[in-house]
């Protein structure tokens, strides 16, 4: 077989495996057949043949009755390998594949045409050593004759050569069917004048209802003719103008698409995109229109290359293309700029407002993912941002950044700002990575009061070894208010040896005031890593969860405080580098579980009220990550059937306990002053006061001091009850147990002249000391005393207290009246005060009745004349 035929090959049967000598786009475009002179069988893939490799097939059926195996490429014009379903991106590879498919179709058309018995270089029809079957009889002298006609002619001497004319008609019909058939790519192959030129033509008008955009190639008797050389084409009139006129009988095939030149011709026109099909019955132009309607702009439309190489450190400057894309997005009513995968060199600020505008609305910029869409920023100055979101305070913006990696150019490492949010509200930045810049993210209140940044959201991002990963910056007289800006799932990789994770910068004109924020952030540190740096900063209601690893330093000047409603937990070393802590603070830094004062020794620790060397820190409510240490100290819930109680626990070791105390107004936590404390063993209760009152709701209670324990009111409090008694009591003057015993002899009294005991009930008479060794000046009773005693009358009476209590029921008492005793003694020249018979106090007179009765007995004895023996 003549191997000028590129897409059809036949092998003799006998083998089972056969090579595919041509390239193809899809296996469905390759046809394998068994053929003979009068029969053909198209085989099915997998069941009747299979692919051994990409370039070899194996026959699986019996080849009896066939002498050849034919492998033919038959590329479909309707089943496009590339359908441009995603009209948002026209890739060079897709265009090449589409061109290749068109080229294959054209090549197959050429082979089909050549197989249709083309002319050779001498102008003769060439059957290529094959039989011509179904040949009509010739009609004129120059017609071919078939075998029957030849036999008839030879046998009958009559010519039926006129039937050969039908052969020409059949060939023309076949070629025309080939050109117009639905199984071939329309507007690709056309045959002129049914396959035979009239002769002398210098122009061919294409009689087609569909538009013919370009005719880059024609074949005249198989000889390739190039547009611009052997002919020209006017697509407005559909006219081909030939350099040389045609000869009679020339076979002319016109190809309307071949190679890159043809496809470029189609796409070059203003309506080129409307000529390319896409999925769903759309054209590429329709797909582009829908993209524009959905507000997505590509920098590639404006020449972006995305060809930066980290290996060679070279690439096209795509800044202008990005600026143009942003400008178009703004023009199309604040739409989105989509950044396909690639690395793009940027050398100027990309303002999402477009140009140098400062407006509320602007474009969003979105990449294919931070691992795919990369902006390499060659910063012209340390403070120049790669992307800026600049707006008007107090109103929400449409601007945002998503799925991008922003990193520094190798020549400007540590320079520039990744993303600047200035005087803007509600900007969203998500799925990002910013690396090796001067500042990763800067939130800036710029220049004037009322210029503030608020409610910006940063999620699912990593800030990697920028000089400052996150900065809040109050510039000059910019508003001090930063509020509502939240960070969620942020990895803050701090640059070693001086890098800062979060920096908050105010100024003497006003502190940067952060409030109503939620932070979920993980700090990664190391040698010289500063987690936070405060300069003129204050906060309210900033909360969330912060964690750390490796060494992290927290710095602050003397004008700053950072209160965080959430924990900061770290498995690394934490260093507090703060100015002198203020007198009114729990620490410059305060978290739910720790404070920058956590290593400061408490003032009262050395006063004996607290254990030596202790410091204060907040008590977390949860037990997590404390299980290995017994979860102390802690408060906890005690539960059971009908039990809902509180528990308090501390470490059971000397020096531990529960401390309750006070701070002066606006005092420092390290100046905590314990007032009451219990030891952990429950063996002591202590107070720092010199006097203490235990008071009941009705006002009764006890008063304790260093000298006294007494009731709070007079006569209402009992010590013990009839069935709840004290066993013993020890006092300075008395010991009370089984006896009431004074602590020293003859020095204690029971009652006083003004506070008397009403009744004493005794089982035996009182014992009175009468030991001569305890007495001095012993002598007989004075006669004058006995004389006076004879004049003292006996009386009976009722006590006033009893009358007041019992009235007429008060009982009578008998005895002496003390005043009468005094008067009688005075009448006989005696001083009653010289005798222990009478006690005179502020509240009245009292008599020692046992001594009075002794005088009475001595007086009677004298009257009876009884004398001592």
From Swiss-Prot:
Domain Peptidase S74 per the UniProt entry, residue ranges: 770-869
Keywords: Degradation of host capsule during virus entry, Degradation of host cell envelope components during virus entry, Host-virus interaction, Hydrolase, Protease, Viral attachment to host adhesion receptor, Viral attachment to host cell, Viral tail protein, Virion, Virus entry into host cell
GO biological process, one term: symbiont entry into host cell via disruption of host cell envelope
PTM remark: Proteolytic cleavage and release of the chaperone in the host cytosol stabilizes the folded protein. The cleavage gives rise to the mature tail spike protein but is not essential for catalytic activity.
GO CC, one annotated term: virus tail
Entry's Gene Ontology molecular function annotations: peptidase activity
S-S pairs: none
Keyword Protease belongs to the record: yes
Compartments in which it is found: Virion
SUPFAM superfamilies, A to Z: Adhesin YadA, collagen-binding domain (SSF101967), Pectin lyase-like (SSF51126)
Site note Cleavage, residues: 770-771
Keyword Cytoplasm carried by entry: no
Domain remark in the UniProt entry: The N-terminus anchors the RBP to the virion. The central part and C-terminus probably binds and degrades the host exopolysaccharides. The C-terminus.
Subunit and partners: Homotrimer. Interacts (via N-terminus) with depolymerase 2 (via N-terminus); this interaction probably gives rise to a branched tailspike.
Function: Functions as a receptor binding protein (RBP) and probably mediates the attachment to the host capsular exopolysaccharides. Displays a depolymerase activity that specifically degrades the K3-type polysaccharides of Klebsiella pneumoniae capsule, which allows the phage to reach the host cell membrane and bind the entry receptor.
Family stated for the protein in its record: In the N-terminal section; belongs to the Teseptimavirus fiber family.
Official protein name in the record: Depolymerase 1, capsule K3-specific
Source species: Klebsiella phage KP32 (Bacteriophage KP32)
């Amino acid at each position: 077989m003549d191997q000028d035929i590129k897409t059809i090959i036949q092998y003799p049967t006998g083998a089972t495996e056969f090579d595919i000598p041509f390239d193809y786009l899809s296996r469905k475009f390759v046809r394998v057949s068994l053929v003979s002179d009068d029969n053909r069988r198209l085989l099915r893939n997998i069941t009747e043949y299979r692919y051994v490799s990409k370039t070899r097939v194996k026959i699986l059926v019996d080849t009896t009755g066939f002498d050849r195996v034919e492998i033919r490429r038959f590329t479909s014009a309707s089943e496009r390998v590339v359908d441009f379903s995603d009209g948002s991106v026209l890739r060079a590879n897709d265009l090449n594949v589409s061109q290749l498919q068109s080229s294959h179709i054209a090549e197959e058309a050429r082979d089909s045409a050549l197989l249709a018995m083309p002319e050779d270089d001498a102008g003769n029809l060439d059957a290529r050593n094959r039989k011509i079957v179904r040949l009509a009889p010739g009609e004129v002298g120059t017609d071919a004759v078939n075998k029957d006609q030849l036999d008839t002619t030879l046998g009958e001497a009559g010519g039926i050569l006129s039937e050969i004319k039908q052969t020409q008609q059949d060939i023309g019909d076949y070629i025309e069917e080939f050109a117009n058939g639905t199984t071939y790519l329309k507007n690709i192959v056309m045959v002129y004048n049914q396959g035979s030129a009239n002769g002398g033509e210098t122009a061919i008008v294409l009689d087609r209802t569909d538009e013919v955009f370009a005719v880059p190639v024609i074949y005249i008797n198989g000889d390739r003719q190039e547009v611009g050389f052997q002919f020209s084409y006017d697509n407005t009139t559909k006219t081909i103008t030939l350099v040389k006129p045609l000869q009679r009988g020339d076979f002319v095939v016109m190809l309307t698409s071949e190679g890159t030149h043809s496809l470029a011709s189609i796409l070059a026109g203003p309506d080129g995109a409307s000529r390319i099909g896409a999925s769903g019955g759309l054209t590429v132009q329709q797909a582009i229109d829908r993209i524009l309607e959905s507000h997505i702009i590509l920098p590639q439309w404006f020449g972006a290359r995305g060809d930066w190489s980290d290996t060679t450190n070279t690439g096209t400057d795509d800044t202008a293309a990005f600026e143009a894309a942003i400008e178009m997005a703004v023009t199309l009513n604040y739409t989105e700029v989509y950044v396909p995968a690639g690395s793009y060199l940027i050398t100027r600020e990309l303002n999402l407002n477009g140009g140098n505008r400062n407006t509320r609305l602007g474009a969003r910029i979105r990449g294919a993912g931070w691992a795919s869409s990369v902006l390499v920023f060659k910063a012209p100055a340390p403070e120049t941002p790669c992307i800026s979101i600049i707006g008007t305070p107090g109103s929400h913006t449409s601007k945002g950044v998503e799925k991008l990696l922003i990193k520094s150019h190798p020549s400007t490492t540590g320079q520039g700002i990744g993303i600047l949010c200035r005087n803007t509200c509600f900007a969203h930045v998500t799925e990002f990575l910013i690396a090796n810049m001067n500042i990763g993210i800067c939130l800036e209140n710029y220049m004037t009061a009322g210029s503030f940044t608020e409610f910006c959201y940063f999620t699912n991002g990593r800030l990697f070894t920028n000089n400052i990963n996150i900065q809040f910056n109050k510039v000059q007289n910019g508003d001090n208010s930063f509020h509502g800006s939240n960070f969620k799932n942020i990895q803050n990789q701090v640059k070693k040896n001086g890098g800062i994770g979060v920096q908050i910068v105010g100024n003497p004109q006003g502190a940067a005031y952060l409030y109503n924020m939620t932070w979920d952030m993980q700090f990664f540190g190391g040698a010289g890593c500063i987690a936070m740096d405060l300069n003129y900063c204050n906060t309210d209601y900033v909360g969330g969860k912060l964690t750390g690893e490796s060494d992290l330093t927290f710095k602050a000047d003397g004008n700053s405080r950072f209160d965080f409603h959430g924990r900061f937990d770290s498995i690394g070393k934490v260093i507090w580098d703060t100015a002198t802590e203020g007198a009114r603070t729990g620490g410059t830094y305060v978290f739910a579980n720790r404070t920058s004062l956590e290593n400061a020794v408490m003032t009262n620790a050395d006063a004996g009220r607290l254990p030596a060397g202790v410091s204060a820190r907040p008590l977390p409510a949860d037990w997590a990550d404390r299980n290995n240490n017994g979860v102390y100290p802690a408060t906890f819930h005690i539960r059971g059937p009908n039990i809902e109680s509180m528990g308090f626990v501390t470490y059971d070791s000397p020096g531990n306990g529960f401390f309750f105390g006070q701070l002066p107004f606006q005092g420092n936590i390290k100046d905590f002053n314990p007032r009451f404390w219990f030891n952990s063993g429950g063996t002591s209760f202590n107070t720092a006061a010199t006097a203490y009152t235990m008071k009941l709701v009705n006002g009764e209670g006890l008063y304790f001091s260093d000298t006294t324990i007494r009731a709070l009111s007079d006569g209402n409090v009992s010590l013990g009850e009839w069935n709840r008694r004290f066993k013993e009591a020890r006092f300075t003057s008395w010991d009370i147990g089984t006896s009431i015993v004074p602590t020293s002899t003859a020095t204690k009294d029971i009652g006083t002249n003004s506070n008397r005991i009403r009744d004493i009930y005794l089982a035996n008479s009182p014992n009175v000391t009468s030991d001569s060794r305890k007495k001095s000046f012993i002598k007989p009773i004075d006669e004058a005393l006995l004389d006076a005693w004879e004049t003292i009358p006996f009386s009976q009476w009722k006590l006033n207290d009893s009358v007041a209590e019992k009235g007429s029921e008060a009982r009578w008492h008998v005895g002496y009246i003390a005043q009468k005793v005094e008067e009688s003694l005075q009448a006989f020249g005696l001083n009653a005060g010289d005798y222990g018979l009478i006690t005179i106090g502020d509240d009245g007179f009292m008599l020692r009745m046992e001594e009075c009765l002794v005088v009475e007995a001595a007086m009677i004895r004298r009257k009876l004349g009884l004398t001592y023996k």
